[in-house]
Swiss-Prot record:
PANTHER family: GPI ETHANOLAMINE PHOSPHATE TRANSFERASE 2, PHOSPHATIDYLINOSITOL GLYCAN-RELATED. It is an enzyme of class 2 (transferase). It is found in: Endoplasmic reticulum membrane. It is a multi-pass membrane protein. Glycans are attached at N186, N401, N490, N627. Signal peptide: none annotated. Its EC number is 2.-.-.-. Ethanolamine phosphate transferase involved in glycosylphosphatidylinositol-anchor biosynthesis. Transfers ethanolamine phosphate to the GPI second mannose. Pathway: Glycolipid biosynthesis; glycosylphosphatidylinositol-anchor biosynthesis. It holds the Pfam family Phosphodiest. GO terms for cellular component: endoplasmic reticulum membrane; plasma membrane. One of its GO terms (molecular function) is CP2 mannose-ethanolamine phosphotransferase activity. This is GPI ethanolamine phosphate transferase 2.
Length: 767
């Protein structure tokens, strides 16, 4: 009876884990309150209103346009740089606050407000409409309110954000990262026609190809310079039309990136590369008003060129230049370099006062009991005062529901309590393993309260796995090699991400070793399939043909997208033939350098199989290896480390479910492999042993979740809450719900020989 009671306790604990996540998330990621309606012009007591400088705007967004892509000596934007030198373009580096993904960045540029971190999740859901801006005040809504027409071509995130707003539009799917060319051609083909049209007030373009190249091959890809020159040619086309066509004479051209990218080509975090997109305001009118800048130039700090402005400053600046009211919820400050567009000092003061009054209104909405007038100095429109108000408002942009935070934390604590006593009961039989797990949990829980440890979590798991292997070595007197090599396979985290590693530095210089390991990995997979298949020759032939097809598939992909891995190898004579083979483009998206790591896993599993470990020791070994291999594959606690390059294998069109599943499988390939391996390392556990495995897994999941929740609650006002702790919480959700609930727990069930095939096929399917 006591055993059945403990079994129910584990079941209830897993249910409580889901409940705790639901409650805590609703309090941690709320939608912030916004002022309703549209802004109108307010009196400024100046007696004169600043006239608009431009009649229409061309707003060109190049996804992931990092500042150095435009301003550095290695840039492909030669024409754009000539505009800077002539004074026709005013260059800036925009500061894109985290999260650096498209949807929240577009919200910042159109509303002038700081988006919710929940937009990171909504950004992935292609069909999501809950994050619409149709009823919020934006500079697009202000143009529409004045009778203007809007046209948009490119990333369909705009159509999601502004349903029914555009008079003409053609959206492209933003997450189909295999497409470098057609996704931009579908925008470019509309440009000449729209430039000749006279009916629009705002022409918006959003190009995705450069971002897709970054996700696939990084900022140093051989495709990057070609794409930059292509985008530069579009800038030249638009500027020529602005000079030649009469109806475009009073047009403002804005060229910007929504965010940047890191050295791996990803984004979502807060590294200098991710938060530093380029921003340029272009018009022939600027040539008579400004002093030209040099271009190209050197960055004066990490990717900071010229002057840095906040991305939300785009909104009030556009409003002032186009003669629009500043949107109600804007936290932006008018960029002072554009005050020179008004010769009358009264007009300049009018612009600043309207900005100050709008900021005052926003502050009253956030702090209704605050007497702002009493603490505002007479020079209230001064840019330093506005910047201070901007900083305060940005820091309070998201209000937590503390009741739900504490309630969710309490429910998580109940789950820990329910699983603790059954786990503690296992200590009498498996004292060393359970004690080791308890020490890990205590150390891990304390580590979650330090941002540096969260950023470098991989170091913790590398040391933990090493310590556990020492114990297994002493216990069995058999060595377990490979953990050091696995650690060096992909450098990750924040401090050591750019350090040399095996995948990016060793293999490109030793290509024959790489391909020998790849071939050996596929051979081992083939042998395992044959040995675990039916005795029928048909099954064995199918296993052999499948493995051969998978290898040549991979070979063709590498020849197409990473030919540098073939140039000096023994396979180079057939490279030209491989490049000409037609394949489905979405399938060209996997990393060959990670294939040999599966062979290392296999060798480690063979050694472990000789150790005759108990069911609990196998579970703990699998659990530790899962966490270690997640980082060994290049994962981290930053949103930018999510690898989308494998999310489209075999898919011809976007599907949020299929892409989501493939994204999880590709990023958790190592943990899934070790969850499957655990079943084979202890293939016939008793019911009591399976219960013990589920107990340890549940206890670890519950304590990890509670630790992260506690850290996020106590440190919710921390400087790094949105750049370190919130991403960590999102990763914890993936570990708890997807990996624990759908991978680890089912792996402890009493399943049949199917798992043997799952274990063997995984090396092929996940690549």
């Amino acid at each position: 009876m006591a055993f059945k009671g403990e079994h129910r306790a584990i079941l209830i604990a897993n249910i409580l884990i889901v409940v705790a996540i639901s409650i805590f998330s609703s309090g941690f990621f709320p939608y912030k309150s916004l002022l309703p309606g549209l802004a109108t012009f307010a009196e400024t007591n100046i007696g004169t209103v600043a006239p608009k400088v431009f009649d229409r705007v061309i707003f060109m967004v190049i996804d992931a346009l990092r500042s150095d892509f435009v301003y550095s000596k290695t840039s492909g934007f030669s024409f754009t740089q000539s505009l800077i030198r002539s004074g026709a373009a005013l260059p800036f580096t925009a500061h894109a606050s985290s999260p650096t993904v498209t949807m929240p960045r577009l919200k910042a540029m159109t509303t002038g407000s700081v988006p919710s971190f929940l937009d990171v999740i909504l950004n992935i859901a292609e069909s999501d409409t809950s994050s619409t801006l149709a009823y919020q005040d934006t500079w697009l809504a202000q143009i529409k309110a004045q009778g203007g027409q809007l046209v948009m071509y490119g990333d369909d995130t705009w159509i999601k954000l502004f349903p029914g707003v555009f008079d003409r539009c053609d959206g492209t799917t933003s997450f189909f990262v295999s497409d470098f060319t057609e996704v931009d051609h579908n925008v470019t083909r509309h440009v000449p026609r729209e430039l000749s049209e006279r009916d629009w007030s705002a022409f918006i373009m959003h190009f995705l190809g450069l971002d897709h190249i970054g996700h696939k091959a990084g900022p140093k890809s051989r495709h990057m310079m070609t794409k930059q020159r292509e985008m530069d040619s579009i800038v030249a086309l638009i500027y020529a039309a602005m000079e030649e066509q009469e109806h475009l004479q009073s047009t403002l051209f804005v060229l910007c990136g929504d965010h940047g990218m890191n050295d791996a080509g990803n984004h979502g975090g807060s590294s200098p590369g991710e938060i530093s997109p380029a921003l340029l305001f272009i018009s022939p009118k600027f040539q008579t008003k400004t002093t030209p800048e040099d271009s190209p130039v050197e960055a004066f700090s990490d990717l900071q060129y010229y002057r840095t402005v906040e991305q939300v400053d785009i909104t009030p600046t556009l409003a002032g230049l186009l003669g629009l009211p500043i949107p109600l919820n804007s936290l932006g400050v008018f960029i002072p370099e554009f005050l020179m567009m008004w010769d009358n000092d009264a007009h300049r003061i009018d612009i600043l006062l309207r900005n100050a009054k709008q900021m005052l209104s926003a502050m009253k909405g956030t702090f209704p009991d605050l007497d702002v007038e009493a603490i505002t100095p007479p020079h209230g429109c001064d840019k330093h005062v506005l910047r201070s108000a901007q900083d305060v408002m940005s820091s309070t942009a998201s209000k937590y529901n503390t009741t739900r935070l504490y309630l969710g934390l309490f429910v998580a604590a109940l789950a820990v309590l329910l699983s603790f006593f059954p786990a503690y009961g296992l200590g009498s039989k498996y004292s060393y393993a359970v004690t080791f797990l308890m020490l890990i949990i205590i150390s891990y829980g304390g580590m979650m309260f330090a941002s540096s440890y969260v950023e470098e979590e991989q170091q913790f798991w590398y040391w933990v796995v090493t310590a556990w292997t020492v114990y297994l070595h002493i216990k069995s007197l058999r060595p377990w090699h490979g953990s050091k090599d696995t650690r060096r396979w992909n450098q990750t985290g924040q401090k050591f991400a750019a350090e040399p590693d095996i995948a990016r530095d060793f293999f490109p210089r030793h290509q024959n070793i790489l391909w020998a390991l790849i071939i050996l990995t596929y051979f081992d997979t083939c042998m395992h399939l044959c040995l675990n298949s039916h005795s029928s020759n048909i099954w064995r032939s199918a296993a052999i043909l499948t493995t051969i097809a998978a290898f040549f598939f991979k070979l063709v992909f590498v020849a197409s997208d990473s030919p540098e891995l073939l140039y000096e190898s023994l396979l180079s004579p057939i490279q030209k033939s491989l490049e000409e083979m037609p394949l489905v483009p979405p399938a060209r998206l996997s990393k060959a350098v990670n294939i040999p790591i599966f062979l290392m896993f296999r060798l480690q599993a063979i050694i472990l199989d000789f150790l005759k470990m108990s069911a609990i020791e196998v579970t703990l070994t699998s659990l530790l290896s899962q966490n270690m291999t997640f980082f060994a594959f290049g994962g981290s606690n930053a949103i930018s480390s999510v690898d989308l390059s494998n999310a489209y294998n075999g898919i011809g069109s976007y599907s949020v479910v299929l892409v989501g599943v493939l994204t999880f499988i590709s990023n958790w390939a190592g943990p899934i492999w070790w969850a499957s391996a655990a079943r084979l390392l202890y293939s016939n556990p008793t019911f009591a042993e399976r219960y013990g495995q589920r107990t340890l897994l549940t206890f670890h999941a519950a304590t990890s979740l509670m630790s992260v929740m506690a850290a996020c609650t106590m440190l919710r006002t921390h400087l790094f809450i949105w750049t370190v702790f919130s991403p960590k919480y999102l990763y914890t959700l993936a570990w708890t719900i997807l990996n624990h609930m759908f991978i680890n727990l089912p792996a402890t069930a009493n399943v049949s020989q199917v798992l043997n095939w799952q274990y063997a096929f995984h090396s092929v399917a996940c690549r």
